[in-house]
Amino acid sequence: MPTFVDQIKIEVHAGHGGNGMVAFRREKYVPNGGPAGGDGGRGGSIILKVDEGLRTLMDFRYHRIFKAKNGQNGMSKQMTGAAADDTVIAVPQGTTVRDLDTGQIVGDLVEQGQELVVAKGGRGGRGNIHFASPKNPAPEIAENGEPGEDHYLELELKMLADVGLIGFPSVGKSTLLSVVTGAKPKIAAYEFTTLVPNLGMVMLPDGRDFAMADMPGLINGASKGVGLGLQFLRHIERTRVLLHLVDLGNQDAELALEKFHDINKELASYDPELLKRPQIVVATKMDLPEAQEHLDEFKKLLEADDTLPETPQVFSISAVTHAGVQELMQTTANLIEETPAFDANAHDEQEAVTYKAPQEAEPDFTISRDDDGTWVLSGAKLERLFVMTNLDHEDSQLRFARQLRHMGVDDALREAGIQDGDLVRIEDFVFEFVQ
């Protein structure tokens, strides 16, 4: 059986746009050919896509860094470079994506075929055909391609099931799942036999069906990570109905009620909204000798319990003899029909949603100074202009200088006290300031 992995961290690096080209027409009988440099192609994006054949994030354990290809550089004769292919990564249904740098939820992938662009490829740089003007009809100006986005993400799988089986270890959750769905979870007479969620489909004679998940057993402190803790609780979030199993064959009614409350306290500690889910209490192992006596007392204690908003419905079953199982499944199906489905936005399978990292309000540029006296310019807008400037051509350098001047960089440097001949650094590029 493959290892179940439901949480993983990955890096995604989109491709850079191709560089624009500086080129001129070289044709017979055209002595003064104009600019003919083409644009660079778009860089490849990183896209997550739901694949219903996947059940775990296991594939990411050994492949956590994903890089898309860069766009092709522009060519002469106004030819645009080819765009790079996008890199598509398959993920299981129910995957939530979080940006670890911002803490923001990037997207929730719940629909088959749903796509999410988690890192957008950079646009191609413009060739010199875009920079011709009456004053400069033959510009040696071209842009470098825009850098692709980089993100550090956490993928978290939350199983999509209509019904979740909850309860302390060894109350019979796996056995019930195997009886009603044909699933084959590991079953044994010791705690935490089930270490991963198991999923199966319940098919009723009337044609109705629903997905049921057997969750690993809860213990006190699970909401704080004790035992299987949070690994289990996240999978309950998407369920519509909870079947709360209590063992009345091997324990008396008072202990069963105490454990019933313990489980609900853990649910409330993790997320109070979970207690609003419809919950059916299922008394298990009713084929054992004292089970009926324990059940009668348990029902009395529930009815007398004033801590409950209302007395829950109680079903008694034996997974061994199958007594009461069909009645429980029919009631569960009815309850599912009355309960709203997990709230997820519908997505058009043909259109990918693109994640845009939130931009904090920041100045176009900032000025600081190194210990050696070099002035340092930084800032997202300024650095983007810099990396897209082709410094191999003097015209491009002059254009960048004009852009800095229009942004107010020159005036700000003078106000900060810069002197003629001082060194200025942008990233790894150093130049001399001239008044």
Swiss-Prot record:
> Which residues take part in binding GTP?
167-174, 192-196, 214-217, 284-287, 318-320
The protein's required cofactor(s) are namely: Mg(2+)
The domain of life for this entry's organism is Bacteria
Q: Any idea of its EC number?
A: 3.6.5.-
OCT domain boundaries: 357-435
What region holds the OBG-type G domain? 161-337
InterPro entries xref list: G_OBG, GTP-bd, GTP-bd_Obg/CgtA, GTP-bd_prot_GTP1/OBG_C_sf, GTP1_OBG_dom, GTP1_OBG_dom_sf, OBG_GTPase, OCT_dom
Keyword annotations for this protein, in alphabetical order, are: Cytoplasm, GTP-binding, Hydrolase, Magnesium, Metal-binding, Nucleotide-binding
Asked whether the keyword Magnesium is assigned, the reply is yes
Q: What processes in GO biological process is this protein linked to?
A: ribosome biogenesis
Localization recorded for this chain is: Cytoplasm
* Domain Obg as annotated: residue spans: 2-160
Q: Which PANTHER family match?
A: DEVELOPMENTALLY REGULATED GTP-BINDING PROTEIN-RELATED, MITOCHONDRIAL RIBOSOME-ASSOCIATED GTPASE 2
SUBUNIT field: Monomer.
Free-text function comment from the UniProt entry: An essential GTPase which binds GTP, GDP and possibly (p)ppGpp with moderate affinity, with high nucleotide exchange rates and a fairly low GTP hydrolysis rate. Plays a role in control of the cell cycle, stress response, ribosome biogenesis and in those bacteria that undergo differentiation, in morphogenesis control.
Q: What is the similarity comment for this entry?
A: Belongs to the TRAFAC class OBG-HflX-like GTPase superfamily. OBG GTPase family.
Put simply, this protein is called GTPase Obg
Please give the organism.
Answer: Limosilactobacillus fermentum (strain NBRC 3956 / LMG 18251) (Lactobacillus fermentum)
Taxonomic lineage is: Bacteria, Bacillati, Bacillota, Bacilli, Lactobacillales
